[in-house]
Amino acid sequence: VMFLGDEQQAIFSFMGAKLDTLDVLRERCKGRIHHLTVNHRSPKYLLDVLNTYASQVLRINADLLPEADNEATCREGELKLLYSDTIDAEYRDVAAFARQLHDNFTEETTAIIVSSNSDAELVSRALRDLELPHFKVSGIDLFSTNEVKLLLAHLNVLANEHNFIAWSRLVKGLKVVETNSAARNFVRSCQNNGLLPSDFLLYEDGSYVQDFVRTCTEKEIVVFDTETTGLNVFTDDIVQIAAVKMREGRVVEGSEFVVFIATDREIPSHLGDIVNPIIEELKHNRQYPHDEALQMFLDYVGDDVLLGHNADYDYNILDRNLRRYCSGIDLHERCPQYFDSLKLMHLLEPDLKQYKLKALLEIFHLHGENSHLADADVEATANVVAYCYERARALLLAQRAFMARDRVKTCAERLRRIYRDLFLDARRRLYTPCAEADRLPLVAELMCFYDALLANGLVEKVDGIGYIEAYLTEDVIDMHCENSLIEQLGRHIMEINTLKEADLCSSSVIRDRVFVTTVHKAKGLEFDNVIVFDAIDGRYPNYYNQTDEGLLAEDARKFYVAMSRSRKRLYISQSLSRIDYHNQPRPNQLTRFMTPILRYFS
């Protein structure tokens, strides 16, 4: 395990982060800690300020402090103290100084770093009075608003239909129920009865589990698996298909099917740490041409229903291979329905930690092995299907009783009315490649859902939605690497879920060169010029933290974070006086944290 961090910047105790954790790691990893010793970003004169502060205020061992890789010396005005008579004057003066930096250094960025959200708003107001374009990062984060969380919840259920939090947000945000607690209870109750909210969208009167039991009872299902040249459903080839037929949870005797397929594409030599067994199998078995082998499988399937483990992958790569090699046969027309034992296990056993085929065989003591050969994997999947069939039959009575409750029927109808068409249309688009000139599928889906919510009065207008759209388009998603919604969700949904407003600051979508940000939001960002606003005792450290040693030390680190956002120039601003509770002027003192570094500033 590797831990990366900088203890000088540990400022999130209010969110539960504890500096004691670093002490534990330091003791645990004694003798095996690597410190980066060269600072490649900061000019030497700025690093001297930060190192002096770290050593004398933060009490960091001088041997652990970095060295500059340059000998840059400070020019006049690059480290400077700024004074204003009062806090009200300081808002105006700092805004005017930011204007000066903006005009004098036309390719550079400037940040005004404040200690509170209210200061950020007042500084922003002063900048607006000067008609100076700027980007404010403070208060409620754009990505933390209920509106944006609702938009992302839609993307999340498309990426993972079993996402409990995303469904809960949708149920509340779409006003199916009134409260967050009620939304969570509804989704949890569905889960406890083998249901997802999507069941109410996919079925008018039934469920995925009920459909599975009915189909297994009335028809034969084809349990199949594929081995392929890779994981891309759009471009990779199938090299083996294996299948068996089942009815009422039992394998139909003599129904085994297997075919190997010739390909000129490269086959991976290893699957993780193991040698890819399909390479040896292909050497010892007849390999059919693509079109012949695929048609053999379709003839075998006939009118039966397909089932696979993680069937979305197998079904869609089969569909793309058919389109490529069999005169454009569309599997969605030929076999429009398929089941997924992975989804069934999620529904029937919602509390498992793993759902891979190998894990299920071990957990439920089922016969078979996950060998990465289609015929062996089909045997294992068939045993999982048999388990699912019996487990599902035992659940049906309770599930139907739950769905018959008036409250559940009311919620289901509301969800259908508001969300069914949006959800089903989006699912149909998941595996549709888009032309290069088109809007990115993920962005198009996000904006389509946003427009629908606006039109139905379910959200207010999101002022920053354009930033999100542009950021995803220009900085996150590469159209040349993934051009379908399913690929873009698979590659980027986790990253999108962790986005913060501050991420926009270092992106190409923010054209502004002046930023207003709180210290906590500034962490991780960097700017050419930094103005630390109103650096007085009472703010650094906070008045209420002065008797608490731990909070006092954290405030010292906050001030370090504020200063260290600078790449070139650093300005410390303060107001000289304030009006006390008795309406009397009182002098302000420059923060005590400046004492050991004051000599560097003019």
For each feature predicted by the language model, list its residue ranges.
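A short beta-strand element within the Helicase C-terminal
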Residues: 240, 320, 515-544, 570-571
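C-terminal accessory regions
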Residues: 387-388, 510, 536-602
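Conserved non-catalytic scaffold segment of RNase H-like nuclease domains
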Residues: 219-222, 229-327, 331-332, 351-366, ...
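Accessory C-terminal helicase-associated subdomains
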Residues: 160-222, 230, 245-247, 411-517
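Conserved helicase motor core of SF1/SF2 NTP-dependent helicases
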Residues: 1-52, 538
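Short alpha-helix plus adjacent loop in nuclease-associated cores
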Residues: 9-13, 138-159, 323, 336-354
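Helicase P-loop NTPase motor core
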Residues: 30-32, 39-132, 283, 454
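ATPase/helicase motor core of nucleic-acid motors
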Residues: 28, 105-212, 362-366, 378-380, ...
